[in-house]
Amino acid sequence: MDNPTTPIAVVGPTASGKSALGVSLAHHLNGEVVNVDSMQLYKGMDIGTAKLTLEEREGIVHHLLDVWDISETASVARYQSQAIAVVEDIQRRGKTPILVGGSMLYVQSLVDDWQFPPTDPSVRAKWESKLNEVGVEALHALLAQKDPQAASIIELKDPRRTVRALEVIELTGKPFNASQPPKNAPPRWNTQIIGLGTNTEWLNPRIDLRTELMFEKGFVHEVENLVGKGLIADSTAGHAIGYAQVLQHFAGELSVDEMIEHTKIGTRRYVRRQRSWFKRDPRIHWIDASGDTFSMALSLLS
């Protein structure tokens, strides 16, 4: 790269190897990693988010891990301001920011100049009342009628984002995604975006294995501890894949086997949304996640 402080973003679906590649690139390029996974922002959400341990970070500085309390509501706008400050501090110190994660809105908030649409408490209250009246799935179906593209990237059982999308649509008179910047504009800081491409035959077994290992490593105990610190089902963290299923198990709604299987299913569903989102961005340089991703990434960057 001509400019050693130009950020590199490593994006792609869950379980594709982003975190390991980020560490390797940081070693090679004198870089520091900036987390772009919304659930890894939460303190104590470790096993279920595949957060790298200190040993796995191999001495590389990782920013924006463990910054939010478990009861806090996630905010892309708040993340954006924090992350921009971190990236620009890394650049001032002459190092390469390595942005790593697959949380779609968070990635775009960082690499694009995304100005967030307005809020209106009365409009939001109206949609929250509608949510309480009909339930999240019916409200999500209404969103799908108004804005199919927004519905395709918002989890079926995510009441907060469903309400927010409907609020934005009403306030702006435009689709929710119209508030996002076009994906053909130059990315902020001229960030180089590398995508880990996967196929279902390769990725699904990795998802299954990773899920099973999560539970073997004490994931249920992790969630139990977080409940003691304020984790509830009706919260941002409580809607996270895996955590939601364990909470359903605690509530007697899922057996152990169902809890594990539903976590796998939820992860595969999320991966489909990630693929759909990222493939629409022509600025992403794709490499094969099943190959030597480090060598391929360096070739792209040279």
Curated annotation (Swiss-Prot):
Site feature (Interaction with substrate tRNA) residues: 103, 124
MF term (GO), any: tRNA dimethylallyltransferase activity
Keyword ATP-binding: yes
Annotated EC: 2.5.1.75
Catalytic activity: adenosine(37) in tRNA + dimethylallyl diphosphate = N(6)-dimethylallyladenosine(37) in tRNA + diphosphate
One Pfam short name: IPPT
Record bears the keyword Cytoplasm: no
Binding site for substrate: 14-19
One GO process term, biological-process aspect: tRNA modification
Alphabetic keyword roster: ATP-binding, Magnesium, Nucleotide-binding, Transferase, tRNA processing
PANTHER family found in the cross-reference section: TRNA DIMETHYLALLYLTRANSFERASE
Complexes and interactors: Monomer.
Annotated HAMAP family: IPP_trans
Function: Catalyzes the transfer of a dimethylallyl group onto the adenine at position 37 in tRNAs that read codons beginning with uridine, leading to the formation of N6-(dimethylallyl)adenosine (i(6)A).
Family the entry assigns: Belongs to the IPP transferase family.
Protein name (Swiss-Prot/TrEMBL): tRNA dimethylallyltransferase
Lineage of producing organism: Bacteria, Bacillati, Actinomycetota, Actinomycetes, Mycobacteriales
Gene for this chain: miaA
